[in-house]
Design a protein with these regions (language model features):
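Surface-exposed beta-loop-beta
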Residues: 199-257
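Sec-dependent N-terminal signal peptides
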Residues: 4-15
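Beta-barrel outer-membrane channel/assembly domains of diderm bacteria
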Residues: 17-114, 135-142, 214, 218, ...
């Protein structure tokens, strides 16, 4: 592990050579207390504590006089104390970012280029979103946008990135654990301002299994999205995704979101997500599962699946203060044909942040989860956050 740390530091120093560069860092703290009650299982109330501290060093190195080509990098050291029968201490060292990027500009178009390690996400943000090593190209014009990405996840650090679906993290592992190896392929076709400032996007995604777990399989997805203004302060986003694993059955993920900005410091969001389950349309759809565990059902350890998830949130932002209140209702789909549903539970969260100075931020988050199937079960957690930039 000492060798890994030396390699990361050496990379950081090498990248500092060349044109004038900028560098900085961040120290953060997250202290979380969790209170959980499971009366339905005749278990005593349980309290646990999680402590997470991180040190991040970043560097931006221009590679051209105009600054349109640059090399960005970031290394991190993270210390976790996870609750268990006995507390689990975990140390993580990671190269979180190593990205060469730039733009080729033409008269009426441009081409964006990115190579290296960086976070990649699909259009929905709920199917594939994790750190990956790869190459990204995008052609931009006022009429059409075309982009493509090819990457490899097997060299990134699982301990500090979004888990691959079906591939478990291990608390006992220290410093570095290779993520499950997949080759993500993403291609997007965009028509900006198709009509009345409405935007249309079509995206295909393939996740190719390169590991020895045959149950992972290859997954393929196609997404269609339409977004734009309804009027000056009201916007919408419609998305639907059809996917398949090894071409055995079809799964669907769809969402509708409305964003309203009544005041300059307030926005209100209403939406609903749908993820297919085995009983939908008499078994026409199979349970939905993405590639990475981005968004889980609040009442289920598995990926968001077999449910409707109505969501409402309101966001306040005024100068250094930012606050978000969100409520979700998790509805289990029992028989979509007969419109029979079961409410599994409710989830509420309040997230607040305050920038005391330009380099000092504090925050406080609260989350409450109520299991409506067993109304005596609930979970509450609160997190105190602090971050100092230098």
């Amino acid at each position: 592990m000492k060798k890994s740390f030396i390699v990361f530091c050496s990379l950081f120093l090498i990248l500092s050579q060349g044109f004038s560069f900028e560098w900085g860092g961040l120290l953060n703290n997250n202290s979380t207390g969790v209170y959980e009650v499971k009366n339905s299982l005749n278990e005593d109330a349980d309290f646990s504590f999680n402590q997470k501290n991180g040190l991040y060093l970043w560097l931006s190195n221009p590679l051209s006089e105009k600054g349109n080509w640059k090399l960005n990098s970031e290394i991190a050291y993270i210390a976790n104390v996870k609750p268990n029968d006995e507390p689990v201490f975990q140390n993580i060292i990671d190269l979180t970012l190593l990205k060469f990027s730039g733009q080729l500009a033409f008269k009426k178009s441009s081409v964006d280029v990115s190579l290296g390690r960086f976070v990649v996400s699909d259009k929905t943000g709920n199917i594939f979103s994790t750190t990956s090593d790869g190459a990204y190209l995008k052609f931009n014009s006022s009429i059409v946008g075309l982009s493509g990405y090819v990457g490899y996840t097997g060299l990134t650090n699982l301990l500090n990135s979004t888990e691959i679906e079906g591939y478990d993290n291990e608390d006992a592992v220290q410093f570095y654990k290779f993520q499950y190896p997949l080759i993500p392929l993403i291609f997007s076709f965009e028509l900006p301002s198709l009509f009345a400032n409405q935007n249309l996007t079509f995206q295909v995604l393939a996740s190719l299994n390169c590991g020895n777990n045959v149950n992972m399989g290859n997954k393929y997805f196609a997404t269609l999205a339409l977004d734009g203004p309804i009027y000056s302060k009201l916007f919408y986003l419609l998305q639907t995704t059809f996917g398949t694993k090894e071409f055995k059955g079809i799964m669907n993920y769809s969402s509708v979101d409305f964003m309203w900005y009544p005041l300059s410091f307030v926005n209100i969001n209403l939406g609903v997500k749908y993820a297919s389950g085995k009983e939908d349309l008499n078994g026409f759809f199979v349970p939905f599962s993405g590639v990475t565990l981005v968004q889980k059902s609040p009442l289920d350890e598995n990926y968001l699946s077999d449910c409707l998830l109505p969501t409402a949130s309101i966001v306040f932002y005024n100068g250094p203060f930012h606050s978000k209140l969100e409520v979700k209702c998790d509805i289990d789909i029992v028989d979509a044909e007969n419109n029979l549903f079961t409410v599994r539970g409710y989830y509420g969260s309040l997230d607040t942040t305050l920038n005391i100075f330009s380099d000092l931020q504090i925050g406080f988050d609260m989350n409450l989860l109520v299991d409506s199937v067993s109304s005596q079960d609930f979970m509450f957690n609160a997190t105190i956050k602090a971050a100092f930039a230098f």
